[in-house]
């Protein structure tokens, strides 16, 4: 995951106040009726809520709205605004705080990897009740499994179990392609697992940064081709290679557009597919000004979307 960023909670709040991103919150919160989202012609650009962990979740929606985001990828993981052990009432309140200022919560991120997770059914039940259409589960590792096919069969059973619960609550499952030892980093294994599963209910959260890290610039296009028929969501990050030693290289996060990802090709493919789901921006690079980092990456995505979707 990413490194800790430099700004303190007090500095973030001061910066938001100076930029007019914090408003008074007098009086009790009143539930707002949820209405179906309006038809879209472009993706829903979101920020991963964990990047705002230093402020209360009640303020997350206002901050994202005033920064110019369309919505929020809401983290429901240990150490987040809404840790799994505090689902009630925080998950519902967190969603209300975001949707109440006119933003969408098109996806939640979880660490759930099994239908037997003690919190998994409750997370999906509340999210389904609140109308959240997508959830991202956690990650499965290959580990030291002596037989890769046996391990993949185990993962398939876990995915089927989770997807069955999610479907009961009208939520689709979006599997994130990570890197390293995570099952599906190269997508071919996950593609095999998903071949017999209804694509309406299980698909991909495609990450071109991890795809480029795994397969290179040219290979990333092939991985996206595998994901596109089942694409549910997108997560964006960028990176460059840096050498920690003469014999090794390390993926170092950087602002969008300053790394190795072929963004022109990526957004052109999204536009051709008429993709209008969530694009989650994750900011894991070091910065002394988080708000400006969010603005930079949001502006980059907006520019790419405008160019690609106008040309498509």
Model-derived features: positions:
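Active-site acidic/histidine proton-transfer and metal-coordination neighborhood
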Residues: 16-17, 58-61, 104, 113-206, ...
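Acidic/histidine-rich catalytic cores of soluble enzymes
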Residues: 166-260, 267
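Conserved, mostly hydrophobic/aromatic
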Residues: 64, 72, 98, 127, ...
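Hydrophobic faces of well-ordered beta-strands that scaffold small-molecule active sites
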Residues: 43-49, 72-74, 105-110, 135-137, ...
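Catalytic domains of carbohydrate-active enzymes, especially glycoside hydrolases
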Residues: 60-77
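N-terminal secretory signal peptides and thylakoid transit peptides that target proteins
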Residues: 1-19
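Glycine-rich, proline-tolerant flexible connector loops at the mouths of alpha/beta enzymes
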Residues: 75-93
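C-terminal segment of N-terminal export signals and the immediately downstream linker at the start
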Residues: 24-55, 59-63
């Amino acid at each position: 995951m990413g490194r800790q960023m430099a700004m303190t909670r007090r500095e973030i709040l001061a910066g938001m106040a100076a930029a007019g991103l914090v408003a008074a919150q007098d009086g009790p919160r009143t539930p707002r009726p949820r209405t179906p989202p309006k038809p879209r012609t472009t993706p829903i650009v979101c920020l991963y809520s964990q990047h705002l962990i230093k402020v209360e979740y009640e303020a997350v929606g206002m901050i994202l709205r005033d920064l110019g985001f369309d919505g929020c990828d809401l983290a429901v993981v240990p150490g987040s605004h809404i840790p799994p052990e505090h689902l009630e009432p925080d998950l519902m309140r967190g969603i209300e705080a975001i949707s109440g200022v006119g933003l969408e919560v098109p996806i939640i991120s979880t660490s759930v990897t099994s239908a037997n997770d003690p919190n998994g059914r409750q997370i999906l039940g509340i999210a389904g009740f609140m109308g959240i259409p997508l959830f991202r589960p956690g990650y499965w590792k290959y580990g030291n499994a002596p037989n890769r096919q046996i391990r993949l069969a185990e993962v398939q059973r876990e995915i089927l179990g989770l997807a069955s619960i999610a479907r009961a609550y009208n939520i689709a499952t979006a599997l994130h392609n990570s890197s390293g030892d995570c099952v599906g980093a190269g997508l071919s294994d996950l593609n095999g697992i998903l071949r017999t599963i209804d694509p309406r209910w299980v698909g991909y959260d495609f990450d071109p940064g991890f795809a480029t890290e795994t397969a290179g610039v040219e290979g990333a296009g092939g991985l996206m081709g595998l994901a596109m028929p089942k694409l549910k969501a997108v997560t964006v990050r960028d990176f460059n290679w840096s050498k920690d030693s003469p014999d090794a290289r390390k993926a170092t996060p950087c602002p969008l557009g300053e790394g190795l990802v072929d963004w022109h090709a990526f957004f052109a493919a999204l536009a051709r597919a008429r993709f209008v789901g969530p694009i989650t921006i994750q900011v894991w690079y070091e910065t002394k000004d988080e708000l400006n980092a969010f603005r930079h990456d949001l502006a980059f995505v907006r520019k790419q979307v405008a160019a690609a979707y106008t040309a498509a």
